[in-house]
């Protein structure tokens, strides 16, 4: 499987690695967690742009580090800016996490944006970079994916994580992998050898076939996701009180419900909003505050168009009841 991963990075990202620069874990989560356990000491800070995937902060805390959040609002497309990154870095900063395309927002960094962030990091040589690329192949509108390890001078301190769950719909097979500096990969290997050992050999064999096989279906599937995204975003923006940016990747949207909070009902925040939506209309979404940004909620459109149409009608009815 390491050979398949090496070929993937060379084929798709023009990155060259050797087998001692590759780790394979029981899902991307284990790879991330092992990396933090291997590198964090008490007091070390990990910069986490918010909104963020919910597991990042707890992984850092479990490893003895300190999560430091950088608010990236709707006005910035939910993306980190060089100015905010520069301001957040201190002598205690050990890692910066970059996730593109993003869970929960679907925001994706362009090559130009990645290079701009890279210029800040080039000046801060003690900061490691964790690039979570798990949604690399779920992208739309001819978006050109670029990962920060492609900046030559940053490659040696970048850990690039990916996996088969999102690209190949193999979530339950639990195969994640990463490429990075030999010393960090070796430390990750030590931790994994004393905890879970190797991932399932059956899953490894399946992942090899996925990585080495034809990739043509990925674009076809992205078209289906794109159609659902367009429908959901356009419908949400037609609902008074709701606004929603058009994401460039992943299979989530992150609409604002600020215009519906504090109206004639007792809904005071996004948590109240999603709770009442579930109670009144049986639609399950996740509050933005769970991802570090209040006043929003996340919808996954990784389901059928039929179910999405029903959900949108129910969300509209619920929102109208709050006006």
Residue spans of the language-model regions?
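Basic, alpha-helical helix-turn-helix
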Residues: 9-10, 28
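PLP-dependent class I/II
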Residues: 15-19, 23-323
């Amino acid at each position: 499987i390491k050979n398949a991963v090496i070929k993937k990075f060379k084929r798709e990202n023009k990155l060259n690695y050797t087998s001692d620069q590759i780790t394979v874990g029981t899902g991307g989560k284990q790879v991330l967690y092992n990396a933090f356990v291997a590198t964090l000491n008490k007091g070390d800070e990990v910069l986490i742009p918010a909104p963020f995937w919910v597991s990042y902060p707890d992984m850092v805390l479990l490893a003895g580090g300190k999560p430091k959040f950088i608010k990236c609002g709707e006005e910035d497309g939910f993306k980190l800016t060089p100015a905010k990154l520069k301001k957040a870095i201190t002598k205690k900063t050990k890692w910066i996490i970059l996730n593109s395309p993003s869970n929960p927002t679907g925001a994706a960094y362009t090559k130009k944006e990645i290079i701009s962030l890279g210029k800040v990091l080039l000046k801060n040589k003690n900061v490691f970079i964790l690039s979570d690329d798990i949604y690399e192949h779920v992208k739309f509108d001819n978006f050109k994916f670029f990962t920060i390890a492609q900046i030559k001078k940053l490659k040696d301190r970048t850990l690039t994580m990916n996996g088969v769950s999102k690209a190949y719909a193999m979530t339950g097979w639990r195969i994640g992998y990463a490429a990075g500096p030999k010393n960090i990969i070796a430390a990750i290997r030590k931790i994994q050898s004393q905890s879970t050992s190797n991932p399932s050999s059956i899953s490894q064999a399946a992942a090899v076939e996925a990585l080495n096989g034809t990739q043509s279906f990925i674009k076809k599937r992205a078209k289906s996701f794109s159609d659902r995204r367009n429908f959901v975003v356009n419908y949400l923006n037609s609902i008074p009180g709701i606004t929603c940016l058009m994401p460039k990747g992943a299979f989530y949207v992150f609409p604002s419900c600020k215009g519906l909070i504090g109206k004639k009902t007792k809904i005071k925040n996004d948590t109240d909003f999603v709770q009442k939506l579930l109670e009144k209309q049986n639609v399950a979404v996740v509050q933005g505050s769970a991802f570090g940004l209040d006043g929003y909620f996340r919808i996954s459109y990784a389901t059928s168009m039929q179910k999405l149409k029903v959900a949108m009608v129910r969300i509209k009815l619920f929102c109208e009841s709050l006006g």
